């Protein structure tokens, strides 16, 4: 079982229709008092502010909690493993992203659409996450382009491997496997919205060569602004406080 957190605008009305933003690591979004590191995205404050300023369409935020023990296995783009030799894929991880996405699409979304007044169609449904949550957001867009109209991927963990194993040789191999997956499975260029970003401090300091190669792939496939955006935030690290600061960028 997973907790699912739902944030509604202060003026929510069942007579209106709302876009929906699905976010991973749901327990990290709203309340620093309950998170493991005493940080939060502050997504409720930021989205509320943007709504009050009429900068975004009326929306609901759905935060799907992670299970800490299986987070890496749940968020790793599972079909990218087909591009790796079996000899280097650990047999004890239990990669499970395809089941996680089925849960999101076949259980969570229908429940939200039934319980709340939502715009159900693809152009009103978005997915967002950071780090491994960035990977699973982009993977969700590739696997379910008929469900998600856009993905926001912050500080995406493009080396792919666990941070305590960040050997360059291994990261090069695993990140290439994901790019090969993207090359074959991305939606038609500019048919969906994809946002990616990174900082250059702490864990994000490892990301530039891998994000640059992914950016080059997107350009080669014809993705262009405003449907494709990749940003760098100098000095930014890999925490909820860092991501909060650029939510309204």
PLM features per residue range, with description:
Residues 1-249:
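Non-catalytic cap/lid and distal C-terminal segments of serine-dependent acyl enzymes
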């Amino acid at each position: 079982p997973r907790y699912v957190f739902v944030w509604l605008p202060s003026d929510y009305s069942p007579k209106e229709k709302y876009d929906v933003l699905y976010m991973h690591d749901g327990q990290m979004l709203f309340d620093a008092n309950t998170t493991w590191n005493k940080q939060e995205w502050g997504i409720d404050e930021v989205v509320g502010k943007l709504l009050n300023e009429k900068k975004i369409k009326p929306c609901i935020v759905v935060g799907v909690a992670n299970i800490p023990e299986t987070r890496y296995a749940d968020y790793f783009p599972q079909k990218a493993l087909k591009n790796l030799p079996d000899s280097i894929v650990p047999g004890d991880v239990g990669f499970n992203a395809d089941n996680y996405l089925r849960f999101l699409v076949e259980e969570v979304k229908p429940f939200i659409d039934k319980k709340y007044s939502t715009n159900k169609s693809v152009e009103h449904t978005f997915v967002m996450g950071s780090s491994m949550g960035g990977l699973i957001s982009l993977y969700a867009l590739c696997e379910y382009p008929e469900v998600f109209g856009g993905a926001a991927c912050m500080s995406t963990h493009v080396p792919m491997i666990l941070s305590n194993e960040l050997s360059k040789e291994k990261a090069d191999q695993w990140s290439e496997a994901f790019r090969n997956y993207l090359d074959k499975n991305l939606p038609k260029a500019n048919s969906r919205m994809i946002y990616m970003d990174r900082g250059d401090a702490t864990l994000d300091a490892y990301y530039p060569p891998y994000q640059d190669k992914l950016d080059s792939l997107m350009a080669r496939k014809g993705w262009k602004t405003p449907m494709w955006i990749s940003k760098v935030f100098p000095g930014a690290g890999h925490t909820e406080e860092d991501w909060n600061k650029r939510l309204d960028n």
